[in-house]
A protein has these predicted regions:
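Acyl-donor (CoA/ACP) binding surface of acyl/acetyltransferases
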Residues: 1-56, 60-67, 103-261
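Generic, well-ordered alpha-helical segments
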Residues: 49, 60, 77-84, 98
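Short amphipathic alpha-helical segments enriched in hydrophobics
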Residues: 61-65, 72, 96
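Conserved GNAT-fold acetyl-CoA-binding loop/helix
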Residues: 69-90
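A short helix-loop-beta-strand connector motif used in the catalytic cores of GNAT acetyltransferases and
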Residues: 77, 90-105
Length: 261
């Protein structure tokens, strides 16, 4: 399990004339802690994964195995050894200190619920990175990952000075595709056989967001604006429902968050 989680964030663009970030770069710091709130006010924290997270990590992964495994990266080498949790934490820390990644644990109100990892960080003329994430089903639909992504993007663009964020998603992962589109990520096309997922090389749709796409707005403000617009739309739809008779179905329920992740 540990090896599969680690490899999930290993792939990314590497063919551009650029250089990796380092701890000497302005704004690049590790360990790093980022905090934010979902539009509903839930506290979300991004921080380094530590050895103390081992029991919670294992518990969450085990409880969500059936939900996560269709999207988990695997090794094309069936004999590749899995990493221990300690080795995973050590590799994450080494990658972060080398400026290659920002591998965050995601907490909701102090409880470990998943990971968001920034990988393939390059500067120079490219100034780009890739982002991957997973989250417990127990917090799906509460805008935990969109909030985590927004807080991280504001740090990457505003503090680290990156220009482009890329996210690659399997075409079958309709929930994540919907999130990318609602958040305004630009779909850049299909990457055939891009990552080894669930035992085979799988196609991925590539999405990207650049500083220009935000139009001077922070990502956090964009998320709050979109969430507010969704609430207004649902309220308007509800108010337009005619008064139900006994033989009619009543107004539709809210059905969860407007952004389905």
């Amino acid at each position: 399990m540990w090896g599969r989680v680690r490899r999930r964030y290993a792939a990314g663009p590497g063919r551009h004339p650029a250089s990796a970030a380092t701890l000497e770069e302005p704004g690049f710091t590790w360990p790093l802690r980022l905090t934010g709130q979902t539009p509903a006010g839930t506290e979300v924290t991004l921080r380094p994964l530590t050895l103390a997270d081992g029991p919670a990590f294992q518990s969450v992964r085990r409880a969500n195995a059936a939900w996560l495994e269709p999207w988990d990266a695997t090794s094309p080498d069936p004999d590749a050894p899995s990493r221990t949790f300690a080795e995973l934490v050590e590799q994450y820390d080494a990658d972060a200190r080398a400026g290659r990644a920002l591998p965050f644990a995601v907490e909701v109100e102090g409880r470990f619920v998943g990971q968001l990892s920034v990988s393939s960080i390059v500067l120079g003329s490219f100034r780009s990175c890739s982002v991957g994430y997973w989250v417990s089903r127990s917090v799906a639909g509460r805008l935990v990952i969109p909030t985590s992504l927004a807080v991280t993007a504001d740090h990457l663009f505003g503090t680290l000075g990156l220009h482009r964020i890329e996210v690659n998603i399997r075409p079958e992962n309709t929930a994540s595709l919907a999130v990318m589109r609602k958040l305004g990520f630009r779909e850049e096309g299909l990457r055939p056989h891009y990552l080894h997922i669930a035992g085979a090389w799988r196609d991925h749709l590539s999405f990207a967001l650049t500083v220009e796409d935000l139009g001077g707005e922070t990502f956090t403000n964009r998320l709050r604006r979109l969430a507010g617009a969704g609430a207004e739309t649902r309220a308007a739809q509800s108010s337009q429902q005619s008064l139900p008779r006994h033989t009619e179905r009543g107004p539709a329920s809210g059905g969860g968050a407007h952004l389905p992740f």
